[in-house]
């Protein structure tokens, strides 16, 4: 597994929200981002068509920023019937945490870190704030398992270093969300 010593990466995260394309690309340029890795499972938006995959493949390079879609890191996953991530209250987050143990996810992280070693990279999803998005869990993995620094870019220009989610721990090359929670007894 690659780590910061291997790839020298700092990964940023950003959510496009409802920003105009020009404001979004200006935020990226101000942060020194040269590549966007789209981590939406379905890279389109009816409400913000400028953030559809084909549109971004056109206007981001015109702004001097490379664009890649990486479905392996996308959200909207199905939870396992007996997820071990009991510290996560929302099914969508538990489902993504379950996905993070798959070879697809781990290969996607390798691809992300390779891309980040080539150009300063931001992973992007639609949710404006990182703590309500699967980018939060991806950042936990990058920080705790891969030892990569993660910075969250906000629409107002603020940059926040990632602090791992409450209840998370690293174990055997994965993150597990179970700290401080007693598992339910079988049959209850």
Give the positions of each predicted feature.
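Residues lining hydrophobic/aromatic ligand-binding pockets adjacent to catalytic sites
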Residues: 1-188
